[in-house]
């Protein structure tokens, strides 16, 4: 050693990293033995100093960082602003979550960065500080949790909890923080147990892939290499990683500086030579790697490089494959034990920001950017290419280049201040990011009615459900209102807008109501627990119920009529068709069969012309069994109900009805069983069975007869035909038709005897084979259609006598076509004939153009007896009825009960009392999700608020012009509430509604641009012409709501003119909260404009939810939602967190070459793209060779980058060589393709790339193949040794396949020799002379063959040579630091 006087003294703190570097340099200079002696001295010195210092750790040593208070306060302030934006509907839940996480993560990081300087200044000898930064115990993250803040935690699923733990462990946690903290602690313990086994299994699979790779030669003779460059177009490679990549490698080419050769080919690189090359500033260095080795199942010394143990070239016989597998798998085992130390604390990255260096004005080219939303919901500009941004100050012009795919957060010509963020560079534009697709469910905070403000489409997988896709960013609105269950409807059947007393009974949401009625009485069956828990089916006592009624008045608005078929009695009046119910006061239980008249009313309550109003199912035409219908060939008119097409249900099946002019029809019974394809049938086709014979395991036959089995798609149809079987003689003439009906009285020939038939029979010829046939005689049921059965006997006669407006006709319909089979489901009966009552109305009157009538229920209570009516009224155009002057009682069509929509029905007086009360609740009825019951939405005064009076309000002059044209139309003080206009439109017509979010508009705004077309269910706001009605009973005023707007005048006093900035408020418009509509006026709350008056508006409060394109909305428009119901599902991408708990699955995912649940870059898709493009450019024979090789090179580099990124993020250093050996094995196979068939390999066969190339050269013809990526499991099962495969997985399958193919195992690998107890071909068992001799012999044979090369092969070799040069140059541009 040098003399002590010449030694250099380094006064530095040595931490763990410095110790590693010191040991490495000592080994390079002095060797192993001397280095161990020096390290012993260092160890002794350390123990002596630690004993003298006698450090102890007390709670007083944990000093909280002083700046923590204001940092946390600032983060809370940002979170509060974010919460307000979310409440106003400016950002949605996912954007809020992202921004909240980044706010708290940044706060936590600032605290962690301040921790070290704080300790250094205040207490440099603090034991906590000394321990954590010496590497002896703990690290900066753990100390940060002790003295900073714990920060954000992950839940057991790896999702982030957006409530941060603001305390540290020194201050102590609150109860909530402790529970959240337990998530991470438990997660660590569980991960330690589970991930250890995962890491062990990963190691086993890795070793399995590469166990046979042994160093068997010194030089394979390859001329290829991979270029490594310290400089890259994206960023500089760190010098440490560059040195780490080069040390221990072998050069693939000479390195020249000028004309001087500083390093030659096949020279191994040590630390000295690498430092010299860095000093010279060499641009790119070509090195040999396991990728470039020409061997198939082994590796040469020069391609591997130096041994990691002693620093010299690797020895022959070294089992480098097993070393590589252990090197990658073992850190995974170790890292799982480290997870719980950070206790599931979230670690992530924030985006890089570009800040303005000083105050100035921003200038950039607006054509190169387009507006977008950032992931936090902020408005920004996205640039696709490098964008030059100029900041102009008074005397300085500064230019900044923004990289592609970055967000520009400022506008052109905007003034910015110093240090203001002007751009956000998106992280990971140059690296492969592990992202996963996450679903975020948003639940409704309150109950109410759902609206949306854009067109929606059905999600493709939910075509028949209530899930819709949003095509663009829009708001979802939950309009306020309380809900009430459906059992309330049973005693509150009223006309729309009626006021009524609602009984305060406890109502369950899931109560079922049904009606069953015959001609004499109406019984209502309850299947709910509203009245008595013990009695499940009971008829309520109406007088008792009326005694329990509350005193609150509500306003009833609903349009959906009962879905159940209600049976009614009918009575007729002049312009309305009123059918009264009859109610029963007895409390006895009544179960009346469903044999009465059923009335079919569409959901929307609208009948079209010639639609079926009521029907009667006669029990005589009802069958339990399946069969076939037969009748004559008279005229049959197919009729489809129009209402069925209008009904809004999930899946609507249309049942065709046949109007028959026949007097009888025939029913041929048969037993039918529809069985799944996999069913075990215990009877044979064309066999004869008796009654109660077992057909399958669970099914027995109901009748005896002939079995007929038909196999159809995915099902088996088994029919049993009852009847007699006859084998006729040859002389008998049997009809070859499928079957004929024989009437009674005719004879049939059977055994030369003649008989007379008593009943109709059905003769069917059955042919089991071509030569054999027999006749099956089946019984027939005959049905006579009697004319006397019609509804005239069931309804009062005056229904059919009056001919004013509405006409009723009676028809008989056969529900099945001639020869059509009828199928009964389980135990249900089949109705064959239906007697229907068809509605029509007089077309000779003035209102002949009307094609619709409307039906609604009315209930009148008189002295405790409740009468229910169904009223059918013609829809008329109300604009033709204008009130006559000086005649307040005459109001045209609007009769007494229409005069005021707020009228109540008193249970005592029995007459309609008109009363106009303030603040009555408005009740709307909606479809429930099960489509069987209904819900009421109660809108009371607490859900609405009034804003006004306003100043500077100006009505648009369109109204004044319309008044001049028609002086009869007057404007009253109040325009009625939205939704309470008289129903005059079809609910299913397309209704225009104003829904937009712009509030302040300069000058006049064309309202046509703001209209969206909706298909609205249950909506009766505006008719097709956009009219809405004033509900003042004495003034029938018709106004156009699209012209009924307010304009607020804002004076601009700086100029001598008045600029008209119009803020438009329209009926039905939605407002977000905190919007100021006029100066010095109050801010609006979020809601929908319900009433527009001269000086004020009434707004129904609503909660907006912002949703972005691609979100899935659960529910229909105007459907009622309860608190906690799923409102919308967001699908977004998020980076997976960086802990090794999720890092290990990432490594496994890359090595298995599969995408589990992430949407990360899938290499298999890239491979397909490469193959297609290269083949298209170069043609088939050239393209496959070059395409496969290019693809393999690209995928290898990408895979190495990904695996290294995971391990480096954990601070684990693994040499690239180990990863390259693994990746080489999983990318070394190609798939023989069908183009250009070869005699050697089968299409779809997996062969090695080098083997394919050599075979092609030997055969002097091209073999077409494609590159494939095998995972480590598939690669282990596709080796040359079947013993190795069988000992890994699927032993029986592998051995059976090998036996059938006659495979030979040459026992070249380590594992198969271990299994059979032989000497392993590695280390001392490696036979050097034999291997070399055989290899040289093979080379001589190949050289003899290559003398006869064809022109094609020479061209191919040249192309491949140039391709390699191209490949090497392209790789040199890439960042090898990620390899």
From Swiss-Prot:
Any keyword Transferase?
yes
Q: Give me the reactions it catalyses.
A: RNA(n) + a ribonucleoside 5'-triphosphate = RNA(n+1) + diphosphate
Cofactor binding mode, per the note? Binds 1 Zn(2+) ion per subunit.
Task: Please state where this protein is localized.
Answer: Plastid, Chloroplast
Kindly list the GO CC terms recorded for this protein.
chloroplast; DNA-directed RNA polymerase complex; mitochondrion
Q: What is its EC number?
A: 2.7.7.6
SUPFAM superfamilies given in the database record:
beta and beta-prime subunits of DNA dependent RNA-polymerase (SSF64484)
**One MF term in GO for this entry?**
zinc ion binding
Q: Which domain of life is it from?
A: Eukaryota
This protein's cofactor list reads:
Zn(2+)
- Which top-level enzyme class is recorded in the Swiss-Prot or TrEMBL entry? transferase
| One annotated GO biological process | DNA-templated transcription
Q: Which InterPro entries match?
A: DNA-dir_RpoC2_beta_pp (IPR012756), RNA_pol_beta''_euk (IPR050254), RNA_pol_Rpb1_3_sf (IPR042102), RNA_pol_Rpb1_4 (IPR007083), RNA_pol_Rpb1_5 (IPR007081), Rpb1_funnel_sf (IPR038120)
Binding site residues for Zn(2+): 220, 293, 300, 303
Q: Which CDD domains match?
A: RNAP_beta'_C (cd02655)
- Provide this UniProt record's keywords sorted from A to Z: Chloroplast, DNA-directed RNA polymerase, Metal-binding, Nucleotidyltransferase, Plastid, Transcription, Transferase, Zinc
Q: How does it assemble?
A: In plastids the minimal PEP RNA polymerase catalytic core is composed of four subunits: alpha, beta, beta', and beta''. When a (nuclear-encoded) sigma factor is associated with the core the holoenzyme is formed, which can initiate transcription.
Which HAMAP family does UniProt cross-reference here?
RNApol_bact_RpoC2
Its job:
DNA-dependent RNA polymerase catalyzes the transcription of DNA into RNA using the four ribonucleoside triphosphates as substrates.
So what family is this one in? Answer: Belongs to the RNA polymerase beta' chain family. RpoC2 subfamily.
State the name under which the record lists this protein.
DNA-directed RNA polymerase subunit beta''
Q: Which source organism?
A: Nasturtium officinale (Watercress)
User: What is the organism lineage in this UniProt record?
Assistant: Eukaryota, Viridiplantae, Streptophyta, Embryophyta, Tracheophyta
| Gene name linked to the record | rpoC2
């Amino acid at each position: 050693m040098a003399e002590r006087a010449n030694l250099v003294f380094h006064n530095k703190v040595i931490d763990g990293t410095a110790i590693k570097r010191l040991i490495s340099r000592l080994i390079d200079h002095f060797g192993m033995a001397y280095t161990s002696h020096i390290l012993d001295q260092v160890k002794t010195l350390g123990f002596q100093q630690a004993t003298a210092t006698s450090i102890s750790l007390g709670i007083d040593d944990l000093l909280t960082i002083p700046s923590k208070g204001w940092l946390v306060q600032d983060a809370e302030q940002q979170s509060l602003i974010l919460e307000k934006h979310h409440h106003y509907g400016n950002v949605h839940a996912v954007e809020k979550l992202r921004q909240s996480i980044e706010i708290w993560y940044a706060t936590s990081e600032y605290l962690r960065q301040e921790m070290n300087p704080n300790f250094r200044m205040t207490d440099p000898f603090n034991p906590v500080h000394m321990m954590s930064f010496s590497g002896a115990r703990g690290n900066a993250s753990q100390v940060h949790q002790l003295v900073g803040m714990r920060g954000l935690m992950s839940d057991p699923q790896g999702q982030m909890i957006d409530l941060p733990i603001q305390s540290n462990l020194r201050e102590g946690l609150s109860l909530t923080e402790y529970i959240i903290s337990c998530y991470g602690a438990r997660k660590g313990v569980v991960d330690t147990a589970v991930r250890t086994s995962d890491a062990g299994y990963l190691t086993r699979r890795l070793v399995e892939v590469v166990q046979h790779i042994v160093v068997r030669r010194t030089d394979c003779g390859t001329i290829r290499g991979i270029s490594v460059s310290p400089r890259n177009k994206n960023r500089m490679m760190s010098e440490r990683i560059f040195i780490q990549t080069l040390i221990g490698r072998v050069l693939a080419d000479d390195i020249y500086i000028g004309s001087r050769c500083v390093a030659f080919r096949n020279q191994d690189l040590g630390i000295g030579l690498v430092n010299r090359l860095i000093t010279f500033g060499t641009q790119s260095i070509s090195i040999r790697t396991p990728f470039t080795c020409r061997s198939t199942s082994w590796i040469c010394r020069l391609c591997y490089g130096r041994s990691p143990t002693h620093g010299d070239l690797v020895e022959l016989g070294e089992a480098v494959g097993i070393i590589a597998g252990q090197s990658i798998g073992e850190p995974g085992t170790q890292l799982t034990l480290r997870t719980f130390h950070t206790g599931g604390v979230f670690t992530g990255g924030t985006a890089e920001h570009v800040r303005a260096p000083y105050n100035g004005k921003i200038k950039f080219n607006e054509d190169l950017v387009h507006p977008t939303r950032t992931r936090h919901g902020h408005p920004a500009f996205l640039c696709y290419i490098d964008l030059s941004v100029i900041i102009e100050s008074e005397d300085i012009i500064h230019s900044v280049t923004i990289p592609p795919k970055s967000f520009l957060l400022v506008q052109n010509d905007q003034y910015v201040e110093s240090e203001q963020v002007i751009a956000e560079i998106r992280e990971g534009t140059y690296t492969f990011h592990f992202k996963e697709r996450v679903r975020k469910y948003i639940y409704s905070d309150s109950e109410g009615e759902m609206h949306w403000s854009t067109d929606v489409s059905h999600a493709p997988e939910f075509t028949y459900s209530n899930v819709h896709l949003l095509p663009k960013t829009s708001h979802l609105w939950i309009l306020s209102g309380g809900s009430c269950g459906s059992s309330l409807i049973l005693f509150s059947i009223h006309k729309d807008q009626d006021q009524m007393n609602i009984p305060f009974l406890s109502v369950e949401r899931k109560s079922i109501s049904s009606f069953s009625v015959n001609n004499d009485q109406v019984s209502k069956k309850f299947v709910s627990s509203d009245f008595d828990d013990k009695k499940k089916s009971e008829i309520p006592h109406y007088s008792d119920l009326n005694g329990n009624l509350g005193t609150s008045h509500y306003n009833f608005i609903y349009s959906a009529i009962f879905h159940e078929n209600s049976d009614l009695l009918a009575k007729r009046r002049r312009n309305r068709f009123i059918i009264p119910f009859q109610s029963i006061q007895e409390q006895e239980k009544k179960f009346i069969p469903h044999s009465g008249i059923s009335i079919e009313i569409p959901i929307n309550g609208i009948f079209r012309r010639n639609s079926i109003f009521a029907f009667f199912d006669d029990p005589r035409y009802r069958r339990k069994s399946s069969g076939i219908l037969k009748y004559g060939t008279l005229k049959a008119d197919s009729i489809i109900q129009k209402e069925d097409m209008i009904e809004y249900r999930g899946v609507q099946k249309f049942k065709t009805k046949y109007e028959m002019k026949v007097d009888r029809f025939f029913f041929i019974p048969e037993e039918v069983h529809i069985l799944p394809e996999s069913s075990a049938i215990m009877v044979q086709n064309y066999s004869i069975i008796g009654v109660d014979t077992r057909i399958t395991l669970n099914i027995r036959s109901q009748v005896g007869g002939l079995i007929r089995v038909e196999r159809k798609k995915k099902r088996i149809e088994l029919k049993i035909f009852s009847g007699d079987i006859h084998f006729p003689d040859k002389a008998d003439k049997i009809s070859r038709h499928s079957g004929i009906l024989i009437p009674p009285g005719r004879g049939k020939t059977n055994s030369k005897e003649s008989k007379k038939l008593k009943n109709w029979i059905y003769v069917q010829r059955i042919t089991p084979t071509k030569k054999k046939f027999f006749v099956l005689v089946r019984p027939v049921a005959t049905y006579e259609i009697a004319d006397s059965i019609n509804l005239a006997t069931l309804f009062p006669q005056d229904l059919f006598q009056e001919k004013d407006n509405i006409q009723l006709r009676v028809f008989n319909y056969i529900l099945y076509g001639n020869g059509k089979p009828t199928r009964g489901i389980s135990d249900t009966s089949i109705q064959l004939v239906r007697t229907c009552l068809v509605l029509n109305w007089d077309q000779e009157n003035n209102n002949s153009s009307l094609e619709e009538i409307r039906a609604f229920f009315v209930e009148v209570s008189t002295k405790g007896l409740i009468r229910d009516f169904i009223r059918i009224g013609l829809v008329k155009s109300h604009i033709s009825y204008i009130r006559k002057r000086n005649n307040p009682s005459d109001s045209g069509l609007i009769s007494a009960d229409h005069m005021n929509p707020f009228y109540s029905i008193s249970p005592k007086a029995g007459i309609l009392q008109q009363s106009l009360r303030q603040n009555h609740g408005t009740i709307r009825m909606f479809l429930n999700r099960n489509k069987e019951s209904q819900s009421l939405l109660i809108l009371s005064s607490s859900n609405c608020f009034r804003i006004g009076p306003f100043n500077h309000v100006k009505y648009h002059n369109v109204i004044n012009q319309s008044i001049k044209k028609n002086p009869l139309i007057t404007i009253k003080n109040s325009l009625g509430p939205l939704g309470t206009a008289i129903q005059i439109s079809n609910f299913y017509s397309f209704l225009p509604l104003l829904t937009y979010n712009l509030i302040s508009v300069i000058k006049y705004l064309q309202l046509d641009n703001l209209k969206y077309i909706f298909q609205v269910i249950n909506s009766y706001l505006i008719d097709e012409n956009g009219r809405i009605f004033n509900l003042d009973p004495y003034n029938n005023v018709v106004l156009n709501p699209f012209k009924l707007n307010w304009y607020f005048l804002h004076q601009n006093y700086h100029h001598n003119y008045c600029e008209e900035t119009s803020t438009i408020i329209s009926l039905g418009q939605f407002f977000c909260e905190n919007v100021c509509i006029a100066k010095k006026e109050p801010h609006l709350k979020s809601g929908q404009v319900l009433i527009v008056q001269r000086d004020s508006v009434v707004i129904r409060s609503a909660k907006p939810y912002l949703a972005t394109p691609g979100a899935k909305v659960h529910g229909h428009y105007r459907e009622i939602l309860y608190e906690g119901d799923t409102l919308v599902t967001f699908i977004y991408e998020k980076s997976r967190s960086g802990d090794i708990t999720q890092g290990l699955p990432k490594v496994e995912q890359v090595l298995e070459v599969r995408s589990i649940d992430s949407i990360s870059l899938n290499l298999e898709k890239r491979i397909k793209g490469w193959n297609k493009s290269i083949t298209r450019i170069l043609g088939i024979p050239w393209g496959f060779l070059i395409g496969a090789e290019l693809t393999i090179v690209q995928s290898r580099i990408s895979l190495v980058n990904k695996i290294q990124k995971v391990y480096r993020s954990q601070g684990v250093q693994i040499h690239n060589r180990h990863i390259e050996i693994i990746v080489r094995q999983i990318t070394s196979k190609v798939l023989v393709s069908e183009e250009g068939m070869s005699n050697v390999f089968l299409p779809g066969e997996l062969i090695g790339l080098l083997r394919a190339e050599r075979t092609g050269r030997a055969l002097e013809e091209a073999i077409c193949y494609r590159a494939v990526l095998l995972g480590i499991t598939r690669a282990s099962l596709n080796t040359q040794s079947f013993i190795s495969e069988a000992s890994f997985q699927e032993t029986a399958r592998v051995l059976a396949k090998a036996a059938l193919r006659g495979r030979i195992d040459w026992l070249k690998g380590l594992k198969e020799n271990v299994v059979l107890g032989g000497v392993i071909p590695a280390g001392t068992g490696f036979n050097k002379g034999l291997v070399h001799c055989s290899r040289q012999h093979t080379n001589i044979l190949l050289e003899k063959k290559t003398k006869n090369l064809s022109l094609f092969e020479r061209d191919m070799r040249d192309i491949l040579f140039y391709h390699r040069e191209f490949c090497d140059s392209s790789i040199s541009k890439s960042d090898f630091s990620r390899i």
